[in-house]
Swiss-Prot record:
Name this protein carries in UniProt: Large ribosomal subunit protein bL32
Keyword Mitochondrion attributed: no
Family annotation (NCBIfam families): rpmF_bact
Family the entry assigns: Belongs to the bacterial ribosomal protein bL32 family.
Gene3D superfamilies: Single helix bin
Gene that specifies this protein: rpmF
Annotated organism of origin: Cereibacter sphaeroides (strain ATCC 17023 / DSM 158 / JCM 6121 / CCUG 31486 / LMG 2827 / NBRC 12203 / NCIMB 8253 / ATH 2.4.1.) (Rhodobacter sphaeroides)
The UniProt record lists the keyword Heme: no
One Gene Ontology biological process: translation
Entry GO CC: large ribosomal subunit
Ranges where the record places region Disordered: 1-20
Keyword set, alphabetical order: Ribonucleoprotein, Ribosomal protein
MF (Gene Ontology): structural constituent of ribosome
């Protein structure tokens, strides 16, 4: 089994972990519909990316109404 050769001090451990923090993404406004979207991603509301429709978004239907 692998065992650490030497003890890692709190200082060295914390210095190594100093780069592990998560950074919140900066949402941008969709130029087509105005909703907030992640940069370099398809808009979830309208399906546009780079002023083109990439994904056809359909209206959500209620499953209870379809079953009845």
């Amino acid at each position: 089994m692998a065992v650490p050769q030497n003890r890692v001090t709190r200082s060295r451990r914390n210095m190594r972990r100093s780069h592990d923090a998560l950074v919140a993404s900066n949402p941008a406004e969709c130029p087509n519909c105005g909703e907030l979207k992640r940069p370099h991603h398809v808009c979830g509301a309208c399906g546009h990316y780079d002023s083109r429709e990439v994904v056809a978004v359909t209206a959500e239907t209620d499953l209870d109404e379809d079953a009845a």
